Amino acid sequence: MKQFFSLLLALPLAAATISDRARDLHRGALVFDAHVHVVNRQFYHGGDIGQRMPDGQFDLPRARQGGVGALFFSIFVTEDYYPQRFETKQTLRLIDLALTQLEHNRDKIELALNARDIERIHRAGKIAAVLDLEGGFDLDGDLGVLRDLYRLGLRSAQLSAHNWANNFADSCCSTPKVHGLNDQGRAVIREMNRLGMVINISHASSEAVEQALEVSTAPLVATHSGMRALNDIPRTMPDDLMRKVAAKGGVIGFQIGNEFHNRKVFDYVTAHAGKPFWDTGDIAARQLPLSIEQIDKLVAPKFPMLGSDAPDALLLTPSEWIGVLERAIAIVGEDYVAIGSDFDGGPTPPRGMHSIADLPLLTGAMLERGWPEPRIRKVLGLNMLRVFRTITEGPGPTFRP
C-alpha cells in the first residue's frame, strides 16, 4: 500500500501547468467529488474501471491523476427503465456491478459507509467510494426496498426519479405529480433520516426541496447543481433555496458543465440537439412492451456521456468557473459549497479541462483568484465530508425482525 501511495504522489496532477504551490495544496487536500458516473460504461460495454480508457471523462487512473480522495459513485438508473417498472431490477444490477468492480480494484478504491471510512481509506492512499443512487430505486418509494439497498451499501439516494417525477416526489424537469412530496415521500425522508442516508435533492423540484427541508431532521445535499441566477433552467437552484439548504447545514455541489452556468453554451447545445438536455420525451413515446435486454440495447449508445462540441471560445475558463463558486459563497458562505463534477454524465467542462484528471486546474484557479488555503480545502472536500459525517455517524439504525 505504501508503494501505491508513493506512486499516487508521483503522478502528474494535470496535463496543463499549475504552480508548485497549487500542486502541493491539491495533493495534500481531501478532494471529494460529489458526483461521478463510474460504472455505466462498464455495464453496457464491459471493461474495468481500473483501466485507462481512450475516451470519456473518468477511470481510476485519471481519478488518481486528478488527486481524487473520495467520490459519490453514481448508481445511475436512466428513465428508460421506468415505463416497464424495471427501475428496482436495474438498481440491483448496477449495484452488483459496482461492488464487483470495487472488489476487483480493492487496492485502489474501497466502499465507504461513513466519514470515518472515508478518512481511513484516504489515509491508506485509496479512493473512498460512496454509493449514491441517481434515478428511481422504486417509483412507489417502497421502504423495504430502501432498507435492502442500505444493507447493500447504498448511502445516498435522490428524491426524484432523475428527470421524471416518481409517485412520491416531483422532479424539477417534468410535470408535477404530487406538488412536491406526498405522505409516502415524507415517509421516505424520515426513513432515510433514521438509516443515516444522504437525501440527495439534485433533480428534485423546488417545491419538493422546500418540503423536504421541513420534514428532514438532517441536512440535505445537492450533489450536482447550479445557480439559476446565472442560467435560468430547471436544473439550477434559485438563491433563496440555496440559502435555505445552507441554513439547515446542507451543502451544494456545483456541476462542472458549461451547460449549467454558461447560457451561451446551453443555447448552443440545445440548438444542436433540438431539445434541452433534460428532455426525455422520446422515452415516454416508445412502443411497449420491451424486455429489459431490449432496453439495455437502446441505452448502451448513450454511454459514456460526453460533453458537447461547443467552440472553445464559448467555454468558461477554469478561473471563470471558480467565479461561479465565488458567487455562491457570497450568497451562502464558504462552508456550504462543494464540487460535484458529473464526469461521464455529459458535462462540457471548462476550457482546457477534459476529464477528472484535470481537477487540479481548479485548485490553481482558486489560488490565482486569491482564495485562502482553508477555503480551498473546504470547497475541495471538507465541506462535503462534514455533512456526510453529520448524516451517517449517528447512533445507527435498528432493524427489527
Regions from the PLM with identified roles:
Residues M1-Q3:
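Positively charged n-region of N-terminal signal peptides that target proteins for export
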Residues S6-A16:
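Hydrophobic h-region of N-terminal signal peptides that target proteins for export
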Residues A15-H179, R228, D232-P401:
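N-terminal hydrophobic targeting/anchoring segments and the immediately downstream early-domain regions
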Residues N40, N193-A212, D335-G346:
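Extended hydrophobic secondary-structure segments
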Residues D142-L146, A208-T217:
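Distinct, well-ordered alpha-helical segments
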Residues H179-A187:
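Active-site glycine-rich loop that binds ribose-phosphate moieties when present
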Residues A187-I201, E207-Q211, D239-A247, R327:
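Substrate-binding cleft of carbohydrate-active enzyme catalytic domains
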Residues P219-S225:
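Short hydrophobic/aromatic-enriched beta-strand-loop microsegments
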